[in-house]
């Protein structure tokens, strides 16, 4: 098991679904890099630095996981990190078509980069960062969907936005 894998995403914020996939990827690969995309087109609620910090806190117990922010093409980031595998999550069949297109594009751009798809545990299959933010924005309790530190950070971020 000498493979370096990248699990890329925006992680705005990291959810229990993300954490579940990270834990399982950490068992499959020698080294897992969580690549947090700057992705300004998504207009994230948390800054890149805040997202890196939150993911670091959630994954602190995993010795073979490293969290790195990046911008630009994912395949270029993978080359910089000497990773040969991309880990992607599939929550539902609806995710498959988009992920299939991404995998094929990434293969064209970097033929040696292999995409591996993991499905979340059933209890996490419906969770998305967008839904978590929506629930939190309307005053709902998100504690069952995110790590306690993420719930606190989200509450603080939303309270600042309201002020």
From Swiss-Prot:
Its main location: cytoplasm. GO terms for biological process: coenzyme A biosynthetic process. It catalyses: (R)-4'-phosphopantetheine + ATP + H(+) = 3'-dephospho-CoA + diphosphate. It is an enzyme of class 2 (transferase). Its EC number is 2.7.7.3. Its cofactor is Mg(2+). CDD domains: PPAT. Pathway: Cofactor biosynthesis; coenzyme A biosynthesis; CoA from (R)-pantothenate: step 4/5. One of its GO terms (molecular function) is ATP binding. The keyword ATP-binding applies. The keyword Metal-binding does not apply. Reversibly transfers an adenylyl group from ATP to 4'-phosphopantetheine, yielding dephospho-CoA (dPCoA) and pyrophosphate. This is Phosphopantetheine adenylyltransferase. The gene is coaD.
